[in-house]
Design a protein with these regions (language model features):
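Histidine-centered acyl-transfer/condensation active-site motif
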Residues: 39
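ATP-dependent carboxylate-amine ligase
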Residues: 32-34, 42-45, 52-214
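Extended acidic/charged loop-beta regions that coordinate divalent cations
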Residues: 1-36, 73, 78-80
Length: 214
């Protein structure tokens, strides 16, 4: 197997350069081939995924232009920055992000697209690693792009630490129904609400959809 690298600058033979800050539009360069990728996926992590796929396919004989056509037809998968609701009140997105790096890159991509929106993030710490406290020092920095953050965890000491580190923006989810009511009560036009979990989150996104659709 061949080892192929790429970068986000012209120092490499293979690289990508964003045309938009949210990385939904980028220039893709592989050797002497340059092409334009425009697709619905946000964030640099998705641009890196696209670049990896393009280069891998190129090794199998697929032209860069053909790979880009396929990527531009890709509409995403469930729970990867999935647009659940968009109306004159709010935008609701559901995402599978469940560890600090994924949370950070997802929120950064959303912030780059929804620059003027207030971002309300609701995050469930569901995995054993997240609940163990191993990543606690990374969680507040991971959510710096969000204006308000709701956390759900079985670890009460972990929740207290998160609140202590960012008291102005941190809230705790004790009840899904109560949280839905609270979010609906203070949400305002142009808000972006994003739920993040690798589980069902006790039906939170569906409950928010129902409440915010009315």
């Amino acid at each position: 197997s061949n080892k192929i690298g790429f970068s986000n600058n012209k120092d490499s033979v293979n690289y990508y350069i964003p045309f938009k800050e949210d990385f939904s539009s980028s220039q893709i360069v592989s050797g002497e081939t340059a092409a334009h990728l425009s697709w619905p996926m946000l964030g640099e992590h998705n641009a890196m995924n696209a670049m990896s796929a393009i280069l891998a396919c190129q090794e199998c004989g697929v032209k860069v232009e053909d790979s880009i056509k396929a990527l531009e037809a890709f509409l995403g998968v469930a729970r990867r920055q999935q647009l659940i609701l968009e109306n004159d009140k709010v935008t609701l997105i559901d995402d599978f992000a469940h560890h600090p790096t994924a949370i950070k890159t997802t929120l950064k991509g959303l912030r780059d697209k929804y620059k003027s929106s207030r971002i309300i993030a609701l995050i469930e710490m569901r995995s054993n690693t997240m609940k163990s406290g191993l990543h606690d020092d990374l969680l507040n920095p991971a959510t710096e792009e969000a204006d308000i953050v709701y956390w759900k965890s079985d670890n009460n000491s972990q929740l207290k630490l998160l609140q202590a580190n960012a008291p102005a923006k941190t809230k705790v989810i004790h009840s899904i129904n109560e949280t839905v009511e609270e979010v609906v009560s203070f949400s305002k036009p142009n808000d972006l609400i994003v739920t993040m979990s690798n589980g069902s989150f006790d039906g939170l996104s569906a409950s928010l959809f129902k409440a915010l659709s009315n």
